[in-house]
């Protein structure tokens, strides 16, 4: 198998590393249903109730195991949970026998072997970083730039339901120490109801805390502009109102409100264009949008240079995805960290029950080597797919 791979890589101008001390011998894949503690409503009928997360374990010839995770939300990005295993199966000849230490080298080979499919590569990349940290005997944040602060600010995401109920959720979260609030908008395609949602959440938490309204690309530039102009007297940020950068720029220009991007910020080109359009006051650096910790780390560095504040997180998931994002977040310039998200706090089951949880609106990454978490392999049960 490796001889055939080496010939293919040579034809692409790449050579395998024959001096490595570790080799990947097995990749195991699980599909785990994650159920939200409350149904999560977003624009255009998008919901998060029960979705599948994909857990990946990479084993080496020296018995080391690295864990990764990716959890695509249906109808959110060009990714789906049941696409991960086929993509990793296709890449298996390039994965098995490869050196997992120093993930970017292997990921570069995989990009040549199978272009695209970055969401599937994201789970693998996280597992490779976990192994790399274990080999080094260091927590991942030490390899991603070094610890920059003691803990990280969280935001609380509020499902798009009746305005008064959203205000109640915001007050309850604030009472538990939260000071940043994302209000989902557009579930009923009623721009006036969205205005009421933002006004009532803003009033509920009082002056000071960050409040932003997120359409997840689900608004027209007209409706989002009407909402923005109606709340322009308030301390509000808008998030990803429309499906194109140009429409988002129109909303920014008409409302005068700061803007955060999410779905449309997913690679170097989109980050640079959003910055040029002046619509990237803040941006969601989600691991699986970019292709894992390796690519998200490069996006982090670019955003620090461009001056954008970042929400360092992932699309959805449990403890593995949360831990990976926390390591990257804590290694980021604190002046550029808007917030992070404890995804594992919104869903059940927990795949690593002893992983960190929120405390008074903040959270810290795990301290052990690599990801620093203990995955409950017994609870996962037998894997759905084993590549070896």
What would you call each of these model-derived segments?
Residues 26, 59-135:
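Metal- or metallocofactor-binding catalytic centers and their adjacent structured scaffolds
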Residues 142-145, 149-255:
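Metal-dependent enolase-superfamily TIM-barrel catalytic cores that perform enediolate-based chemistry
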Residues 2-15, 19-27, 32-36, 48, ...:
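Flexible C-terminal active-site loop/helix
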Residues 119-120, 125-159:
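Glycine-rich, aromatic-flanked loop segments that form ligand/cofactor-binding clefts
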Residues 86, 234, 243-258, 265-362, ...:
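Shared catalytic-loop signature of beta/alpha-barrel
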Residues 24, 56, 63, 91, ...:
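Conserved, mostly hydrophobic/aromatic
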Residues 54-60, 355-358:
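Short beta-strand elements
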Residues 66-68, 152-158, 181-183, 211-215, ...:
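Hydrophobic faces of well-ordered beta-strands that scaffold small-molecule active sites
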């Amino acid at each position: 198998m490796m001889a055939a791979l080496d010939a293919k890589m040579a034809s692409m101008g790449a050579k395998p590393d024959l001096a490595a001390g570790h080799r990947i011998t097995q990749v195991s894949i699980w599909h785990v249903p994650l159920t939200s503690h409350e149904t999560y409503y977003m624009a255009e009928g998008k919901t998060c109730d029960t979705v599948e997360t994909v857990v990946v374990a990479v084993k080496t010839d020296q018995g080391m195991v690295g864990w990764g995770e990716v959890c695509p939300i249906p109808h959110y990005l060009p990714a789906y949970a049941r696409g991960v295993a086929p993509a990793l199966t296709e890449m298996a000849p390039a994965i098995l026998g490869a050196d997992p230490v120093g993930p970017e080298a292997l990921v570069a080979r995989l990009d040549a072997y199978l272009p695209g499919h970055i969401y599937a590569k994201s789970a693998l990349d996280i597992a490779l970083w976990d192994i790399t940290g274990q080999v080094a005997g260091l927590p991942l944040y030490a390899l991603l730039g070094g610890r920059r602060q003691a803990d990280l600010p969280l935001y609380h995401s509020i499902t798009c339901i009746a305005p008064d109920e959203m205000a109640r959720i915001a007050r309850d979260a604030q009472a538990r120490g939260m000071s940043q609030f994302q209000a989902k908008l557009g579930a009923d395609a009623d721009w006036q109801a969205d205005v009421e949602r933002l006004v009532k959440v803003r009033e509920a938490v009082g002056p000071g805390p960050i409040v932003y309204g997120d359409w997840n690309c689900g608004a027209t530039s007209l409706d989002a502009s009407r909402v923005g102009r109606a709340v322009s007297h308030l301390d509000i940020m808008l998030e990803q109102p429309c499906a194109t950068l140009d429409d988002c720029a129109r909303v920014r220009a008409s409302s005068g409100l700061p803007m955060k991007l999410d779905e449309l910020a997913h690679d170097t080109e989109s980050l640079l264009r959003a910055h040029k359009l002046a619509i990237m006051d803040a941006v969601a650096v989600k691991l699986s949008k970019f292709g894992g910790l390796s690519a998200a780390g490069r996006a982090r560095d670019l955003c620090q240079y461009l001056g954008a504040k970042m929400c360092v997180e992932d699309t959805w998931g449990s403890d593995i995805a949360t831990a990976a994002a926390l390591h990257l977040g804590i290694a980021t310039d604190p002046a550029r960290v808007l917030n992070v998200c404890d995804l594992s706090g919104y869903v059940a089951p927990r795949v690593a029950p002893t992983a960190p949880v929120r405390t008074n609106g903040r959270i810290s990454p795990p301290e052990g080597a690599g990801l620093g978490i203990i995955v409950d392999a017994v609870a996962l049960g037998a894997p759905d797919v084993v590549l070896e």
